[in-house]
């Protein structure tokens, strides 16, 4: 039982350090007037992320651009590294995702309540709410606001864990059925390949969704 608990709270620091170091290795900064294809792809990717995440923000919100781009690259690379054989995805640990979600959510909400108190409080009561529903709506909206970091972390954890578990179960079935019939192993092997491709897409999409929701929370309170 103690080993199970320690495994649940175990944080694979090595994978996270690789995810932090990979952008510096794979995405070099341009130091010459004529750039190569790799640097062009790098610049296009960063511009695409900035366009998707920051198009709704004002000048104050744009100060978060470096944070949001770094967050997207970090989560995306961490998810991709977790798909390597004999590796482990830190984003399958709820504690890791909560350690990212709670500070980022706090950083978007606290400035809103500090500098735009009336506007932030107005979000707790939608316009046109009937009088008899006001107390209930305020409670519901407050709970909805407070559980946002939890839903952020749980969404990322659930999606990454589900994908890895599905690949593991299908791979185990492939090995088990390999001695039965050649056609069966072919079908299951193709299924594993397709699931792996799907999980590669999910790894990048979940990184984008996590950063996008933080961006929307920031826009709501900026």
UniProtKB/Swiss-Prot annotation:
Record's keyword annotation contains DNA-binding: no
User: Mostly located where?
Assistant: mitochondrion
Q: What cellular-component terms does GO give this entry?
A: mitochondrial inner membrane; proton-transporting ATP synthase complex
Q: Name one GO molecular function term.
A: proton channel activity
Catalytic activity as recorded in UniProt: H(+)(in) = H(+)(out)
Enumerate the SUPFAM superfamilies for this protein: F1F0 ATP synthase subunit A
- UniProt keyword annotations, A-Z: ATP synthesis, CF(0), Hydrogen ion transport, Ion transport, Membrane, Mitochondrion, Mitochondrion inner membrane, Transmembrane, Transmembrane helix, Transport
Write out the GO biological process terms: proton motive force-driven ATP synthesis; proton motive force-driven mitochondrial ATP synthesis; proton transmembrane transport
| Pfam families for this protein | ATP-synt_A
What gene name does this entry carry? MT-ATP6
Sorted alphabetically, which NCBIfam families does this protein's record hold?
ATP_synt_6_or_A
Q: How does it sit in the membrane?
A: Multi-pass membrane protein
Q: What is this protein called?
A: ATP synthase F(0) complex subunit a
Could you give the subunit structure recorded for this chain?
Answer: Component of the ATP synthase complex composed at least of ATP5F1A/subunit alpha, ATP5F1B/subunit beta, ATP5MC1/subunit c (homooctomer), MT-ATP6/subunit a, MT-ATP8/subunit 8, ATP5ME/subunit e, ATP5MF/subunit f, ATP5MG/subunit g, ATP5MK/subunit k, ATP5MJ/subunit j, ATP5F1C/subunit gamma, ATP5F1D/subunit delta, ATP5F1E/subunit epsilon, ATP5PF/subunit F6, ATP5PB/subunit b, ATP5PD/subunit d, ATP5PO/subunit OSCP.
Q: What does this protein do?
A: Subunit a, of the mitochondrial membrane ATP synthase complex (F(1)F(0) ATP synthase or Complex V) that produces ATP from ADP in the presence of a proton gradient across the membrane which is generated by electron transport complexes of the respiratory chain. ATP synthase complex consist of a soluble F(1) head domain - the catalytic core - and a membrane F(1) domain - the membrane proton channel. These two domains are linked by a central stalk rotating inside the F(1) region and a stationary peripheral stalk.
TM region(s), chain numbering:
8-28, 64-84, 93-113, 127-147, 160-180, 197-219
The listed locations are: Mitochondrion inner membrane
Organism field: Loxodonta africana (African elephant)
């Amino acid at each position: 039982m103690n080993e199970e608990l320690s495994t649940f709270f175990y944080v694979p620091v090595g994978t996270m350090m690789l995810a932090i170091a990979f952008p510096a290795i794979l995405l070099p900064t341009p130091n010459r007037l004529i750039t190569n294809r790799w640097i062009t792809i790098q610049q296009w990717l960063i511009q695409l992320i900035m366009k998707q995440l920051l198009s709704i923000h004002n000048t104050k919100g744009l100060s978060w651009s470096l944070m949001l781009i770094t967050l997207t690259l970090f989560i995306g690379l961490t998810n991709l590294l977790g798909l390597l054989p004999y590796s482990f995805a830190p984003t399958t640990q709820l504690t890791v995702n909560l350690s990212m979600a709670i500070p980022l959510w706090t950083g978007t909400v606290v400035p809103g309540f500090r500098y735009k108190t009336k506007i932030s409080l107005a979000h707790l009561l939608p316009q046109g709410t009937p009088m008899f529903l006001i107390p209930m709506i305020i409670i519901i909206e407050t709970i909805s606001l407070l559980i946002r970091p939890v839903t952020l972390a749980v969404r990322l954890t659930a999606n990454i864990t589900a994908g890895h578990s599905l690949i593991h179960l299908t791979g185990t079935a492939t090995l088990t059925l390999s001695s039965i019939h050649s056609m069966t192993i072919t079908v299951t092997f193709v299924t594993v390949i397709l699931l792996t491709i799907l999980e590669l897409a999910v790894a990048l999409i979940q990184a984008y969704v996590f950063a996008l929701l933080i961006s929307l929370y920031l826009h709501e309170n900026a």
